[in-house]
Amino acid sequence: MDIKINDITLGNNSPFVLFGGINVLEDLDSTLQTCAHYVEVTRKLGIPYIFKASFDKANRSSIHSYRGVGLEEGLKIFEKVKAEFGIPVITDVHEPHQCQPVAEVCDVIQLPAFLARQTDLVAAMAETGNVINIKKPQFLSPSQMKNIVEKFREAGNGKLILCERGSSFGYDNLVVDMLGFGVMKQTCGNLPVIFDVTHSLQTRDAGSAASGGRRAQALDLALAGMATRLAGLFLESHPDPKLAKCDGPSALPLHLLENFLIRIKALDDLIKSQPILTIE
């Protein structure tokens, strides 16, 4: 099942789409500079591109952690990104009242993993009519995503994307079950499935409020996921991850973006040049 996002076709058998950008908006200048690099690289490589960033990280572990620029300022920044680069934008919402204002600016609205079973939020998102990206909760099996999908469909919106972001593996660790991609496709009517490699790299230190990460393994994990024939890749970068205000240890250094995507595209092209082989 394919979904249209402006002039971009998103489907498990179509060339992969990059949902890329920064974890959280820090300021206008850094946002535009980062987006400009993404646009330059993706246009050079012929990769369909959607800019991503959060205006508010409402689920930070510590009350003292940076959350973002807020809804009003965030929407102004997204408007400037769209005006300057002419690309679609995705961002996440956390409360029902945010859905309509965000839908008026952004092309895709994201349901955070921790909030994926909140029915009132699901209903408010569905009512916008926008394309919805559903983050799979760390605590949910791939097959259980069908229940969230059904909520959206009952609320009148079937324009859905499913996003893997890792599963809890004991305490303070995440793993990615590569078989889960196929399970989500099978149980949810072959909706587009994308892979959030960045957040799948997170680790926790029991003594710290900040997330750790394994960015050195980003390419290995991304290639493994994309080998399962996915609709897209979800990726966060930063010009200097050590200075990032959220999830720096999992962010790809921005200067490595082109070499990273060259490898992802080569694999995606190879996988999708072959007919689907069904094994019963």
UniProtKB/Swiss-Prot annotation:
One of its GO terms (cellular component) is cytoplasm. This is 2-dehydro-3-deoxyphosphooctonate aldolase. Pathway: Carbohydrate biosynthesis; 3-deoxy-D-manno-octulosonate biosynthesis; 3-deoxy-D-manno-octulosonate from D-ribulose 5-phosphate: step 2/3; Bacterial outer membrane biogenesis; lipopolysaccharide biosynthesis. It is found in: Cytoplasm. It catalyses: D-arabinose 5-phosphate + phosphoenolpyruvate + H2O = 3-deoxy-alpha-D-manno-2-octulosonate-8-phosphate + phosphate. The gene is kdsA. InterPro entries: Aldolase_TIM (IPR013785), DAHP1/KDSA (IPR006218), KDO8P_synthase (IPR006269). It comes from Neisseria gonorrhoeae (strain ATCC 700825 / FA 1090). Keywords: Cytoplasm, Lipopolysaccharide biosynthesis, Transferase.
